[in-house]
Amino acid sequence: MIISSFVRLSLIVTLVAHSTALAITQTSSIPRGHLVERVEALNDSSQSYALYLPSNYTPDRKWPVLYAFDPGARGRVPVERFKEAAEKYGWIVLGSNNSRNGPWNVVVNAWNAMLTDTHQRFAIDDERTYATGFSGGARAAVRIAAACKCIAGVVANGAGFPVDLAPSSQMHFVFFGAAGVDDFNYAELKSLEEPLTKAGIIHRVQTFAGRHEWPPVPVATAAVQWMELQAMKGGKQPRDDNFISATWQQFLREARTLEAATRYSEAYQLYLGLAASFKGLRDVAEIETKVNQLGNSRELKAAIRDEQAQIRKQRQLESRLNTLIAARDGGASINQTEEGFDAGNLLPKILNDLRKQSRASEDSTDRRIARRVLDGLFVGLFEQGIGLLQAEKNYASSIKSLKLATEVNPDRPGAFFYLAWAYAGNRDKKKALQSLTTAVEKGFSDAAMITANNAFDSLRNEPQYQQIMARLQKQ
């Protein structure tokens, strides 16, 4: 079965010792109020991060900090999403340019580098250190928080806990989860409600209109706003009654809007979160009554049944596609009486049907399921192909995975780039050039990734390769 999962390693995060008394150095040249794409670590120039310092940053007081982990080492992306909240609430935000899905030591090294460097450069509030991540980066953030005991809260986007780590009463951090309704990990984030509650972990899970991606700016801002609230509740931030009242009214309006739009499941979760989040900060009796009323309503029960049916159909389609892939790869056909197709014909038919459903202009059950299934299959194949290519140099198997990834989603240029790499490694110049051409035609624009890759050395003198590079230089 083809699955996408975070690498299961049980290494313990080893923190580099630090003290708030460390000298704050080399910050004068870093602009405030602007995203800086690359800050090299003072102790290791191979480690870098994207950074946002609030415009009013001063070393005269300590600041909350949010460390971000992207599955593809794109440090800029999370900083872009969280910089508005950073400016509004006075947080330092940084995203590693090194951390990525793969060997756990890569994540640990990036984490240690960021942790050490920020304490050397900036005035950090060690009581208010947070971590966020997307997909495999979300699992990395959770694992770090569970291991180091220094993280006050985690914002997990597009994924939850590592497969070998479950919510526990020993965990000290609060948890904010976010997932798009079209995310193939949507069910995973939603299913965390029960284990988080049983473990006594203060939490909120928010959904948004989107796929498997970092959350949009409003959701990222809501996550930081919620963390501010929890800091006040936990005594790590001075109580601000105006902030508490305004946040209460905002969340209450959002819940009522969802309920009025008959989005009962989302409304119920928000009401439930309101009661839990504000208990101890203000009277929540009215909302607790609302939670009980809505929890027993026919409307919510119907919404839950519909959501569960979506998840079941998603899982059934995922299983069916994986079976068809295995049958096609093995040269065998399955259930040939089904619609008169064997595996080789049935697989592209199902993929075509799902792509049509995924392109629908309006949200629907069919569109959500199609997008979840296609994106989940693509990511699984893509990550598998890259692992076989880079870590194992198993070019033939990598070609098989990446080629299928391009069939699942023919609009993603990155898959064609890595497929070209695999073909080049397998000494198939013709297909390597074809795939590289397709990658550029579909939007691949990073000429440096091609010129720096030794796998393409055998192609440099080919006229088609030179045409590709000339086209990139004109862009």
Where does each model-flagged region fall?
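A domain-start/cap signature at the N-terminus of enzymes
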Residues: 21-63, 107, 136, 251-254, ...
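Gly/Ser-rich "nucleophile elbow"/oxyanion-hole loop immediately N-terminal to the catalytic nucleophile
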Residues: 55-62, 104-135, 149
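Short beta-strand element of the alpha/beta-hydrolase
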Residues: 61-71
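Primarily recognizes the serine-hydrolase "nucleophile elbow" in alpha/beta-hydrolase
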Residues: 78, 118-121, 127-173
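Short beta-strand/loop motif that positions the catalytic acidic residue
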Residues: 176-179
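C-terminal catalytic histidine-bearing segment of alpha/beta-hydrolase fold enzymes
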Residues: 190-193, 197-274, 285-302
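Residue-level recognition of tetratricopeptide repeat
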Residues: 256, 386-387, 421
